[in-house]
Amino acid sequence: MQRWAKRLLLGTMGAATLFLLAYGLFWPRAESVMGEVQGGARVVVIDPGHGGEDGGATGVSGTREAELNLDISLRLRDLLSLAGCRTRMVRQTDTAVYTGPCASISEKKVSDLKNRVRLVNETPQALLVSIHQNFFSEGRYDGAQVFYAATPGSAGLAERAQQALRDALDPDNRRACKRAASVYLMEKIHCTGILVECGFLSNYAEEQR
């Protein structure tokens, strides 16, 4: 893995521990929530964005977003498991999660998204963390950013996650967390959920660090 990917990975893993700790310590009914997370009653659903034919964004040096999302997510799962958290992966290989006869890429993407939503919503006591990489037509943008669902607890969790990413990865990052408007997965889930854009694949300087 390239150095920049390792840097993003370590920052994301550290942030995961921090935001879950913050969620447990400072949210209402803190002792109950933290006990549920560490005891395994709460399930952290980890969603590596894209997969299979849908590679997501492609970095300036050819890095596929889907593969990087999966690598980060698998390591995040391992870290959270070591911390006593119960996890569930949306996917564990570089494959999409569509089902049924899908004749086109568009149909596969629709099926894939619906299956992700169903998996999250059928998981009792779920807390969703969706992992993605950002991309923009201009290469000057950088930094991680957290987006949140409209469900209870999501905005507060996103704020703490954004701060944790800033502390662990990029002290100069001044990006603010935002509502994930028009993101199908985040609009359809019923549980607390955030989407983490770990960095910009379109930023060559960030990639080379």
Regions found by a protein language model. Give the residues of each.
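Catalytic-site microenvironment of enzymes
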Residues: 1-209
